[in-house]
Amino acid sequence: MAEQASEQQNITEKEKEQLPLTIKGLSESLGIPFVDCLIPCNFCGKFLDYLEACEFEVKKLSLIWKDYCVFACCRVCCGATATYEFNQFYQQTVLGRDIELAAGRSIFEIDIRCQTCLAFLDIIEKLDCCGRGLPFHRVRNAWKGICRQCKHFYNDW
């Protein structure tokens, strides 16, 4: 009996594609206010508070679906994940505008996340890093830089 229930919970790839990837999308599909969404962190199990849910959206992170259970990533675990990925999967570093040569694309077309908090860098943040000659790191085949919030941790404002 438990095996049948377990088999019924397995999610197919087609069904997975139809599930919402954002908290906003989830709240709309459930017909509930965004503020009422309680989503556990995939790593520590703590429920994201309202501010963390908003940060999750601003960072353009995607929800994680395991069977039909949804998970996100809290602020603390975003930082821990970023650090772990950097330490385990570092590939290369380039300075400033050299990222365009390394990636073979314009800075406007390159997706870059913050190496500290995983926020998605906007064009102003990317140009700021280029103009200051700050490092961009290739980690797990993705580019990392430093966002406007985290650069204050490095006393670089």
UniProtKB/Swiss-Prot annotation:
The alphabetized list of GO BP terms reads: DNA-templated transcription; regulation of DNA-templated transcription; symbiont-mediated perturbation of host apoptosis; symbiont-mediated perturbation of host ubiquitin-like protein modification; symbiont-mediated suppression of host innate immune response; symbiont-mediated suppression of host type I interferon-mediated signaling pathway
State the source organism's domain of life: Viruses
Cell location? Host cytoplasm; Host nucleus
Q: Where are the zinc fingers (unnamed)?
A: 41-77, 114-150
Q: Which Pfam families match?
A: E6
**SUPFAM superfamilies according to UniProt:** E6 C-terminal domain-like
Q: InterPro entries attached here?
A: E6, E6_sf
Give the CC-aspect GO terms: host cell cytoplasm; host cell nucleus
> Which keywords does UniProt give here?
Activator, DNA-binding, Early protein, Host cytoplasm, Host nucleus, Host-virus interaction, Inhibition of host innate immune response by virus, Metal-binding, Modulation of host cell apoptosis by virus, Transcription, Transcription regulation, Viral immunoevasion, Zinc, Zinc-finger
Q: GO: which molecular function terms?
A: DNA binding; zinc ion binding
Stated family: Belongs to the papillomaviridae E6 protein family.
Q: What does this protein do?
A: Plays a major role in the induction and maintenance of cellular transformation. E6 associates with host UBE3A/E6-AP ubiquitin-protein ligase and modulates its activity. Protects host keratinocytes from apoptosis by mediating the degradation of host BAK1. May also inhibit host immune response.
Assembly description: Forms homodimers. Interacts with ubiquitin-protein ligase UBE3A/E6-AP; this interaction stimulates UBE3A ubiquitin activity. Interacts with host BAK1.
The name under which this protein is listed is: Protein E6
Source species taxonomy: Viruses, Monodnaviria, Shotokuvirae, Cossaviricota, Papovaviricetes
